[in-house]
Every structure is written in structure tokens, then in C-alpha cells.
Amino acid sequence: FIFINIFFYRISEHGTDRSAQILIFLLIIELLILINLDSHFRENSTKFFILLILIISLKSFYILYLILLFPILYYFIKDKKIIYVRDFLKNPLFYLSFLTFIFILLVNFFNSGCLIYPVKITCFENFSWTIPLQEVSQMNNWYEQWSKGGAGPNFRVDNPEIYIQKFNWVGNWITVYFFNKVSDFLYGIIFLSFILFVIFYSKNNKVEVPYKGIILIYLMLILLFTEWFYNHPALRYGGYPLIALLLFLPIAQYLSKKNYLNFNTNIRAY
């Protein structure tokens, strides 16, 4: 909540980019709840899938977040909770979410001839309305060039096809983008994390209740971060929640082991 109000305070910048990224934070919270709580499974699973579909509907490339289904399947099998799958399949909202997902793909298909535009391998070139594959590739390369710091309102790099390949772009990206936007964002979340750490830190450990899924979810986030950094390293294309969550989750896991009795007592006293 604090993060959203500090870093996403300008409503004019929200659009579909910021809104989807706010929902990603909620999605991770609901994922942890779904994995760790046996009660209210139907309600928790409903919230998770509604959030997931909403995120994908706002930006099609967030279809990559379907990878977060893996921790659910893993722990259902590991903890022998397959019985929950039956309850899940009886939930009409599951089928509504699935149909919504199919509808999103169809809308993309009828608009561009691609299931996910501008990803060339998802395009069907045999239909009359399909955008020519060369134009799809050019648009994809343009988005990649822009996100890698190779283009802006007043400049373009030479040889963009070579620039976006492998890690040729990293040096220039650090100069024109990292130290303008990413570094400020990192300073902000590190400072916010420090403030919250100081407020909630306690030397008294409490009886630890292990939270399942933290490590596996963290690995999924690292995979998503790697894909983000290699293909479209702009904060507006999913960087905000990935960077923040990679920092917040370990801190939250550490602070969850502490006893907040003294902190709560002081708050009540004031």
C-alpha cells in the first residue's frame, strides 16, 4: 500500500501499464495465501484467477505470469491436496476466467492476426486481416529498441537491429535509462525498505511458522525478471513489481520471524 501511494501517485501515468503492475502485487499476496491456507480454498482460488486474468487482459504480454500456476500445482501434489482440484473445477468462476482468457486471445487475433501482438510466432499469416509479418517484426524490434534505451523523442541509435541483439545495448541503456529512472526507483524502494525494517525490527524471535512457497515463488520472479531484463527492460513493461518484490519478499520473510509485541504495545500507548 505504501509502495503504491509513493511510486504510483500520478493518476495520469496509470493507463494499463501501472494498473496491471499494481494487480501483480495483489496476485503474489493471493498466491501465498492460496498455498499456505487450507481454509476458504474456493474463495482464495477465485480471487487469484480473477486477478491473473485481469492482469493479462490489461497487457497481453503478462501472459508470462501463467508461470505462477506452477507453485500451486507443485504444492497441491506435494501436500496431497489434489482433492482441492475437484472443488476448483466445480467453481463456475474458473470457467468464466478460462473463457475470458480465450476471449482475450481471440480479440488479439481478430485485430491483428496474432494471439499476442507483436510476438511473431503467435501470428497466422494466412488470414486476410493479418498484419504482415515483416511489420510485426518491425514493431516488436521498435518496442525492444525503445525499452533498451536505443530510441527516444530526440534520438535513435545507429544499426538498431544489431543494437538490440544479445547484450550490445547494456552500456547505452545504463547511461540513458538506468541512471535516469531505475536508479531513482531503486533508491526509493531501498529507503522505504530501510524505514519499514527499522520500524518493525525486533530482537525477540517468535515461534517460527514456516511459509510455504516463498523460495519457489522467488525463483519464478527471478525467471520473470530475467525475461524482462533481456527483452524489454523498461519499468513500465513490468519492471516495477518485479524489482520491488525481489527486494520486499526476503525482508518480509525475515521480519515475519520477529515478535512485534513491544511495537504494538508502544503504538497502543500513543
Q: For each predicted feature, which ranges?
A:
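Membrane-interface anchor segments at the N-terminal boundary of transmembrane helices
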Residues: 9-12, 159-217
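Transmembrane alpha-helix segments characteristic
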Residues: 1-4, 27, 47-51, 98-99, ...
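Multi-pass, polyprenyl lipid-linked donor-dependent membrane glycosyltransferases
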Residues: 1, 6-33, 238-240
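Membrane-interface alpha helices of multi-pass inner-membrane proteins
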Residues: 8, 44-60, 64-71, 99-102, ...
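Membrane-lumen/periplasm interface segments of specific transmembrane helices
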Residues: 91-183
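Hydrophobic transmembrane alpha-helices of multi-pass, membrane-embedded glycosylation machinery
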Residues: 22-28, 54, 65-78, 241-248
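Juxtamembrane "helix-exit" motif on the non-cytosolic side of transmembrane helices
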Residues: 4-12, 78-79, 111, 201-205, ...
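Perimembrane helix-loop-helix junctions
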Residues: 65-98, 254-256
